[in-house]
Amino acid sequence: MERIKELRDLMSQSRTREILTKTTVDHMAIIKKYTSGRQEKNPALRMKWMMAMKYPITADKRIMGMIPERNEQGQTLWSKTNDAGSDRVMVSPLAVTWWNRNGPTTSTIHYPKVYKTYFEKVERLKRGTFGPVHFRNQVKIRRRVDINPGHADLSAKEAQDVIMEVVFPNEVGARILTSESQLTITKEKREELQDCKIAPLMVAYMLERELVRKTRFLPVAGGTSSVYVEVLHLTQGTCWEQMYTPGGEVRNDDVDQSLIIAARNIVRRATVSADPLASLLEMCHSTQIGGIRMVDILRQNPTEEQAVDICKAAMGLRISSSFSFGGFTFKRTSGSSVKREEEVLTGNLQTLKLRVHEGYEEFTIVGRRATAILRKATRRLIQLIVSGRDEQSIAEAIIVAMVFSQEDCMIKAVRGDLNFVNRANQRLNPMHQLLRHFQKDAKVLFQNWGIEPIDNVMGMIGILPDMTPSTVMSMRGVRVSKMGVDEYSSTERVVVSIDRFLRVRDQRGNVLLSPEEVSEAQGTEKLTITYSSSMMWEINGPESVLINTYQWVIRNWETVKIQWSQDPTMLYNKMEFEPFQSLVPKAARGQYSGFVRTLFQQMRDVLGTFDTVQIIKLLPFAAAPPEQSRMQFSSLTVNVRGSGMRILVRGNSPVFNYNKATKRLTVLGKDAGALTEDPDEGTAGVESAVLRGFLILGKEDKRYGPALSINELSNLAKGEKANVLIGQGDVVLVMKRKRDSSILTDSQTATKRIRMAIN
């Protein structure tokens, strides 16, 4: 207070005021403060001071040929004196005015395209509605919010590659555009920006806004989606808020919202299945949101919500340290190990010094043509899920993983001495010795590995030592997945692990998330969510379960039929029949199942009693654990449309109606698909029987010579094409399959394609 009083006294004296306002500023400290460093200390003042000068702007000398020396009013537009310290010319602000009025004009067609985000923002604000202002205390929470509406979800690196490709296509530097979104955007933008005269750097900045999600940690009360965040300064102050309804939605907000709904539905469903973790993964892999695979969105989308994070944890999205082995990139996604030297003996009694990894670890293994997930313990492969383009690529990945596991049976499978050298003629380290050995010939390795019977997990099959697929046996711990094991990419801040009950833990073992944390809130998704997994059939109610079950049976009838006659138990255990059980009255499930299984057994025993329609109709009932009883049923009840409806064991009903004339099945009045006639019923033409192992390409093509008879087909080499005479004298072009795995579906496809080729 004393100081303030003293200052007031001083200021009241006119002499003090005069000194302060009139004296020149020549104190060294002050001069230093305003002149040291490149950073402008008082930009506003500097601007005012500069603009007060006659020629505050410098320009390239070429400007002298483009702008007259004086304007219409006779004012000088540029000075003949050079700018000190550069060879540029000094220019008056009036030159800018002249240029704007009289300078060259250019096409504006590219402006809305380049400045798309700004144009769209203006539209949203124009269409938006601002409501009343309320004065009240604002409770704000700092949240990480998306500040950039209308962006794609590319990572910074992906976006950088796209921008370089579009804006600076001739610059040197390796750029690999891998994702579908990258390629699509690049193509689109190249077309849009042809002959664009806007400065490339500006285009690059604007593209970045469109491609990358920008987040900030901001205090927010209320809406956090990007269309609200862009008007935060208009809608909430410290003590007031203004009601606002955005004038349009943007896809990135819709993706975030729909992702949360999908993740919640999936976690809720997985929690009640026998193996929650496997179920959750299967559902994430087979779900699409707005036409994009959910796993792809999870990988790129930083939304932090419990269910979403559980899904991410299940997919192994976390910080990873990657290394390369056998041409594959390994990223540890979980677990830890300590290294220890150990001496081991090969099958040839050669001693190898191995650095053994002790401990449980999980890895993603990513190569160009194959990918895998590996779970291993000390010198033991627990599980390997591989997917690849072809047999060869899958074999490569399996060899690499088996060697990496350091299992004893792998080391004992070595025949002969290991003495591989590198180009410099130096011996390779033991792990690479083993790798090279088995890459040359893995027969003994695969034979010695051991095989085991397998459960039927959707999307996965077994693989035998000779690399043929199987649905009943597989090399120990090894499975082949139809879906790629996706490359690991992550924005997560911590490493987490998840158990089969979907509990997510950090590295210290603290539980971070569990299904109990997942909100029960229901919402309507903005984008279409397509759940392909049978586990999600029930999300749209009992009718959907009924129709989906029968559609699945019809779609897979060729395989189902074979299993029905050869391995019914495996068929009854298919997860696709699980949802159906909830429709069958609990008390009747076991009795129905026992009855249907007995009926099926009689069909198998008594030749000629095979009835396709009846098998399809009753099959889902056989999936429940059967009760032995002598009960007979003429109809079976299912609970749909709020009451029990009957399916007649023999004959049609509103629930299950097969039209013999059209060969189409309707379930609850909805079309469930067509039944191709069955060879077992003696009615199918010779073509479907003959054309197994062949692909029908279309109508006859004279270039491939005269039509062969059906018997001459057997002489074709794999991949060879020929015309063939079928059925009633029609000729079609066929190709012998390169592999035999899909023979089952050939006869179905053949029948369809013959019809198309002939018509």
UniProtKB/Swiss-Prot annotation:
Site (Avian adaptation): E627
GO cellular component: host cell nucleus; virion component
InterPro entries: Flu_PB2_2nd, Flu_PB2_6th, Flu_PB2_C, Flu_PB2_CAP-bd, Flu_PB2_middle, Flu_PB2_N, INV_PB2, PB2_helical
Gene3D superfamilies noted in UniProt: Polymerase Basic Protein 2, C-terminal domain (3.30.30.90)
Localization per record: Virion; Host nucleus
Motif Nuclear localization signal mapped to chain: 736-739
Record field: transmembrane: none
Principal location: virion
Molecular functions per Gene Ontology: RNA binding; RNA-directed RNA polymerase activity
Keyword field contains Transit peptide: no
Any one Gene Ontology BP term: cap snatching
Domain of life where this protein originates: Viruses
Record's keyword terms, sorted: Cap snatching, Eukaryotic host gene expression shutoff by virus, Eukaryotic host transcription shutoff by virus, Host gene expression shutoff by virus, Host nucleus, Host-virus interaction, Inhibition of host RNA polymerase II by virus, mRNA capping, mRNA processing, Viral transcription, Virion
Classification via Pfam families: Flu_PB2_1st, Flu_PB2_2nd, Flu_PB2_3rd, Flu_PB2_4th, Flu_PB2_5th, Flu_PB2_6th, Flu_PB2_7th
Protein family: Belongs to the influenza viruses PB2 family.
Record function comment: Plays an essential role in transcription initiation and cap-stealing mechanism, in which cellular capped pre-mRNAs are used to generate primers for viral transcription. Recognizes and binds the 7-methylguanosine-containing cap of the target pre-RNA which is subsequently cleaved after 10-13 nucleotides by the viral protein PA. Plays a role in the initiation of the viral genome replication and modulates the activity of the ribonucleoprotein (RNP) complex.
Matches recorded under HAMAP family: INV_PB2 (MF_04062)
Subunit record text: Influenza RNA polymerase is composed of three subunits: PB1, PB2 and PA. Interacts (via N-terminus) with PB1 (via C-terminus). Interacts with nucleoprotein NP (via N-terminus).
Protein name as it appears in the record: Polymerase basic protein 2
